[in-house]
Amino acid sequence: MNRDLRFTALKKTPFHSRTSLASRTNKYYNWNGFTVPTEYSTTELEYTAARNGTSVMDLTPMCKYMINGSDANKFVDYLVTRDLSQMEDNTVAYIIWCNEDGKVMDDGTIFKFSNTKFMLCCAVKIYNWLHDSAEGFDVSFEDATDTTAALAIQGPTSCSTLKNYGADDLELLKPFGMKQYNINGYDVLISRTGFTGDLGYELWTDPANAENMWDSIMEAGKELKIRPFGMHALEMTRIEAGFIQTNTDFMAAEDSLRPVRMRSPYEIGMGWLVHLNKESYFVGKRALKKEKETGNSERCLVGLDIDGDKPAVGSVIYNEKKEDIGIVTAAMWSPTMKRNVALASLKRPYGIKIKENTVSYTHLTLPTSVPV
């Protein structure tokens, strides 16, 4: 019997002509329907560039949504758990948003241009959900993923590289600040943001400018040993920094087939982003307030020190009674810390917070210890 199998071809980013030439491994990854390199040369060299020099990564596949309208500020305030009432124009904020049950839909960054114009960047496609949530608000949405080319320029020499590129006075840009530049005759938005835990910036421009931007930045960083880096190196840096990743360290509520897979902000270390005292209502506020008051969070996300040097991703964690108490969600050997480190989701009371941003020391056998 013949079967008609249909596949959707992966799209190429505006930087593909350059990233494909730079890749010596031909290893690629499907990121939101785009093909991007997982590794250009070796992950170790790319990681080293991110930690000691300048690294460049194609961020174009990241979901990008423009939010416009007279109620844009009010809608964003309704959408996210964080109080953004004091957020200034031309700044960026790290945010999470939940469903009405207080379970995390995704995390991301919100760029504020004015009270009537924002850009939301995140890992999971939420265009339809934004529309469904906006009933009663005077707002419109544009999926800008395909119409905005983006690069991450990360590492301790990233500022010097971008100044060579033409971003004058970039050293004055504060963390989570953003500024519009005109470089080589085209507009470039530069934000001091990133996913490596190091000094870094993200650049946003029209796709027509992508190849010139790539070539110019690579030339600007030539003396600073600039190097492209792929998804594997990014994974290493974000684990070291303790940054969470949707559908890796937790399942997005909309993607979870079973409620038990969903997580609240308090269960993934994001309680500091939940501002229950903000005056306006936000999606999930009632459920999160109840969870906070009753203390009935079932799990927590913690960092681990792993004995030995064997990969620990997906490993089950047991207590002294050989009972399953959690699972390792992400792990790596850290060249910087010279340790085998990991992130893990544990059942409470293991790893319960005792102070804001602090967790208790929980020592486990088999063969993992949990200080965070």
Placement of each model-derived feature along the sequence:
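Acidic, proline/glycine-enriched N-terminal capping motif
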Residues: M1-I95, K103, H232
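Conserved, structured C-terminal
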Residues: M1-R24, N30-W31, T38, K112-L364, ...
